[in-house]
Amino acid sequence: MVFEVIPAVDMRGGKCVQLVQGVPGSEIVSIDDPLAVALDWVSKGAKTLHLVDLDGAIEGERKNSPIIEKIVNTCKEKGVSIQVGGGIRSFEDAASLLEIGVSRIILGTAALQNPELVKQLSSSFGSSHVNVALDAKNGKISIKGWTEECAQTPVEMGRKFEELGAGSLLFTNIDTEGLMQGVNPVPTKELVESVSIPVIASGGVSTLEDIKTLKKTGAAGVVVGSALYMGRFTLEEAINAALGDI
């Protein structure tokens, strides 16, 4: 299995942004045209894009749906897979995205508050289209745009969602997210070894070495945001690092 590097296109107020630890107002990147950003990553070799509606994640209102649909329609024609998260709170929200050609919907808060939703979506659309985001802070699950902490651990919830029909997991270590201080592979490795479905890692990648480190955990891929936008390395360099021997 190829370890995939997935560029993040996070959107807030119709712009492509990168936040520090998900905190509104902490933008370190703000670009007016998310579609142009998405197409730029595709031209540089991205096979999958990670789109997040931050307005949806933080406020529960998916304000960036029109631009997401534009990106999906444009990238579909180029054979690029799109995974979308942020504010998907209901079966209808998820279905509307899958029906326009989104490859994978990412459920966070909704899955934790209503686990049956995972079962319903995987039964209706197939488990390969359903991803559950497990965002962890201090070893515990965090929800509602990282503003509330739960008692459960990522391993407990990962096993539960695999049983319910999730086809993959997205694991974000909030402790390192957006800080550009490197990754902690331990929690990712623990989760990978606890489930049999693919785990995509996210949070804190700042060097090519971080990509190699996460590959060694057995993860299926990594979402990269700030490091790419700030020019720490190019997407081509990241893809080559992911393909290299470890």
UniProtKB/Swiss-Prot annotation:
Would the keyword Magnesium turn up in this protein's UniProt record?
no
Recorded family membership: Belongs to the HisA/HisF family.
Q: In which pathway does it act?
A: Amino-acid biosynthesis; L-histidine biosynthesis; L-histidine from 5-phospho-alpha-D-ribose 1-diphosphate: step 4/9
User: Which species is this UniProt entry from?
Assistant: Methanosarcina mazei (strain ATCC BAA-159 / DSM 3647 / Goe1 / Go1 / JCM 11833 / OCM 88)
Q: Which gene encodes it?
A: hisA
The record, for PANTHER family, names: 1-(5-PHOSPHORIBOSYL)-5-[(5-PHOSPHORIBOSYLAMINO)METHYLIDENEAMINO] IMIDAZOLE-4-CARBOXAMIDE ISOMERASE (PTHR43090:SF7)
> What superkingdom does the record give?
Archaea
InterPro entries to which the protein is assigned, alphabetical: Aldolase_TIM, His_biosynth, HisA_bact_arch, Isoase_HisA-like, Isoase_HisA-like_bact, RibuloseP-bd_barrel
Question: Where is it mainly found?
Answer: cytoplasm
Stated name of the protein: 1-(5-phosphoribosyl)-5-[(5-phosphoribosylamino)methylideneamino] imidazole-4-carboxamide isomerase
